[in-house]
Amino acid sequence: MLTLEELKAEVKADRIDTVVAAFPDMLGRLMGKRFEANFFVDGAFEETHGCNYLLAVDVDMEPVPGYKAASWEKGYGDFVIKPDLATIRLCPWVPKTALVLCDLLDHHDHSPIPHAPRNILKRQLERLSAMKMKAYFASELEFYVFDQSFKEAHAGGYRTLTTPSHLNEDYNIL
């Protein structure tokens, strides 16, 4: 983890040139913006904005009908993307890049967007705390490897995908 002051020092020393300000979408993917690092530390760390359709799309980034908060009928507006400066960290898989997680707030009154995943989690943690309980979390990453490229899978509607093996290989060591 880095403090904002440590991030500024890393940027000044040219060890960081990009800051990714990201939030989880409804599918758990990180969405957000990439900032030139000097621009971020000079003021973008306060807040930025994004379109609220980002919490109302499918895996192909197509708007899904039926959402109360955002739709073609209601219109798509902006929300505030507010960096949580306690989450700044280096992004080891991207050279010279830092990552900061963000909260989503209403564009007009800066209240938390109730259906944003981080805000849902915060409310649940507050409920646990009120009951004198504490949550512990861990990730279990599971995935499938397919023979097709992303482009081929998309073109085929994600149907009839094939795996490199005919076996289910979870938990296999060899």
Regions found by a protein language model. Give the residues of each.
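Glycine-rich, acidic/polar active-site loops that bind/position phosphate-bearing ligands
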Residues: 1-174
